[in-house]
From Swiss-Prot:
Smooth muscle contraction. Probably plays a role for this system in cardiovascular regulation in fish. May target bradykinin receptors (BDKRB). Keywords: G-protein coupled receptor impairing toxin, Secreted, Toxin, Vasoactive, Vasodilator. One of its GO terms (biological process) is vasodilation. Belongs to the bradykinin-related peptide family. It comes from Oncorhynchus mykiss. Plasma. It is found in: Secreted. This is Lysyl-bradykinin-like. One of its GO terms (cellular component) is extracellular region.
Length: 10
């Protein structure tokens, strides 16, 4: 589960 606000593309 990834945390809220995780942006790998960012």
């Amino acid at each position: 589960k990834r945390p809220p606000g995780w942006s790998p593309l960012r």
